[in-house]
Design a protein with these regions (language model features):
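Residues forming the flavin
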Residues: 2-52, 56-146, 150-269
Length: 269
């Protein structure tokens, strides 16, 4: 397998003959021996005349380019629960990985679902009325739900980034994010993607509890943890599990203050 880079002017496409010719040269074989060719990155070069830079993976006919294996999600209705605090990106993908491992995610989110959250955000923008638990920071999808969904990371050492991109495509994002140098989902699509992730989690037996702010976490009698939440109607509910994943985001200061009061370990990102 080799990588080749081709350029073309904006508005023009690379022909199959051009691509296969470049692939044959890179692989050191004849045209008939060229196998698969896959676009892996597209970027704009605006230095001088604006052009596209297109990077392809190519291989011989005797080889195969490695494909993406679609994760299998298990039915977890009767599986061991794991509490996930927060329904932002970290919480959603933690829940998906729990499904892959046969564990039941119980997602507790202080804000509202993405549809109901829109009205609280609009009320804040139009009238200055703040719902402290449902706003730009809190609610399904996390703080970036109502952005244009730019996707970037400063680290390539903490997991398979392409797996995340494929997951977004699976749940409704454009396939262009797999190849664009600066991918973004789009403000019109992002809430749909977030909702589709929730539907998948629930269909496989996971749980979502919105409008549920965590007020206490304490060791349970059987070695696990009891998590107490306060609902929007003022009612308290306790959830129990052996394990908790804290995906509370940067704005949940009350959670960090709770940990500090209990003298539990806290460290900077």
């Amino acid at each position: 397998m080799k990588e080749v880079e081709l350029t073309c002017k904006v508005g023009r496409e690379i022909s199959e003959d051009e691509l296969r010719s470049a692939a044959a040269k890179a692989l050191g074989v004849g045209l008939k021996a060229v196998g698969e060719c896959r676009l892996v990155r597209r970027s704009v070069d605006a230095r001088g005349d604006v052009i596209y830079r297109l990077r392809y993976q190519v291989c011989t006919a005797a080889e195969h380019l490695e494909g993406y294996a679609i994760p299998e999600y298990h039915d977890v209705r009767d599986a061991e629960p794991v509490i996930v605090a927060g329904a932002g990106p970290a919480g959603m993908f933690a829940a998906l990985h729990l499904l892959m491992r046969g564990l039941k995610p119980v997602i507790i989110e202080r804000g509202k679902n993405v549809h109901a959250r829109k009205f609280d955000v609009a009320r804040l923008s139009d009238k200055g009325v703040l719902n402290p638990d449902s706003n730009y920071c809190f609610g399904e999808g996390g703080a970036g739900t109502f952005s244009d969904g730019k996707l970037f990371t400063r680290s390539s050492k903490r997991g398979d980034i392409r797996e995340v991109l494929h997951q977004f495509v699976r749940f409704g994002a454009s396939e262009s994010i797999l190849t664009d140098a600066h991918p973004h989902i789009g403000s019109d699509r992002l809430p749909i993607v977030v909702e589709n992730i929730r539907k998948c989690i629930v269909e496989h037996g996971g749980e979502y509890h919105f409008d549920s702010r965590i007020t206490d976490i304490s060791p349970g009698p059987d070695g696990g943890y009891d998590v107490v939440t306060l609902g929007g109607d003022g009612s308290a509910t306790t959830y129990s599990a052996r394990n908790i994943i804290l995906a509370t985001g940067h704005s949940a200061r009350d959670i960090y203050e709770l940990f500090n009061r209990k003298r539990w370990a806290l460290e900077a990102k």
